[in-house]
């Protein structure tokens, strides 16, 4: 009788394991965007776009846009003033955060960059929303409530 119980329990455990393995979700291939719902006090709104192929992030973009549609990374005056103040500007930190996401595949594993920690927090929040949409296969832009 003990052998029957052990055999039954073994089959239940194996079946459950197979169902869990088959049911696991991964990121769906495609492009996924996220952005904050409002502009910050300086007139910028963060945005992230990721591209997923074969279940992995193959490309990422991070930037801020103003109401006119201009990108922070293209604003030479902002780049110069931020670089003077903190040692790094949006041209560098935007690319570095995006590259780190492609390498690590997980927003929570992306390290903060000295001089751009607030932007790093924004990036992680937005990248996490984009990854959630990729996991769910939602192609509409994820709109994230901005921190005040």
Walk through the language-model features, giving the residues of each.
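Active-site- and interface-proximal helix/loop "cap" or "latch" segments in soluble metabolic
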Residues: 26-148
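Bacterial N-terminal signal peptides that target proteins for export
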Residues: 1-9
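C-terminal motif of bacterial Sec signal peptides marking the signal peptidase cleavage site
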Residues: 17-21
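Repetitive helical segments and hydrophobic/amphipathic motifs
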Residues: 12-13
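Absolute protein N-terminus
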Residues: 1, 23-25
């Amino acid at each position: 009788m003990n052998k029957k119980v052990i055999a039954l329990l073994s089959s239940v455990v194996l079946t459950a394991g197979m169902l869990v393995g088959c049911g696991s979700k991964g990121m769906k291939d495609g492009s996924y965007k996220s952005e904050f719902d409002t502009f910050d006090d300086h007139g910028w709104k963060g945005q992230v776009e990721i591209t997923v192929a074969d279940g992995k992030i193959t490309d990422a973009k991070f930037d801020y846009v103003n109401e006119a549609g201009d990108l922070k990374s293209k604003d030479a005056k902002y780049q110069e003033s931020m670089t003077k103040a903190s040692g790094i500007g949006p041209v560098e930190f935007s690319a570095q955060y995006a590259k780190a996401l492609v390498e690590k595949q997980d927003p929570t594993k992306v390290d903060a960059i000295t001089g751009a920690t607030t932007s790093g927090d924004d990036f992680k929040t937005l990248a996490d929303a984009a990854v959630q949409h990729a996991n769910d296969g939602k192609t509409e832009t994820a709109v994230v409530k901005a921190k005040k």
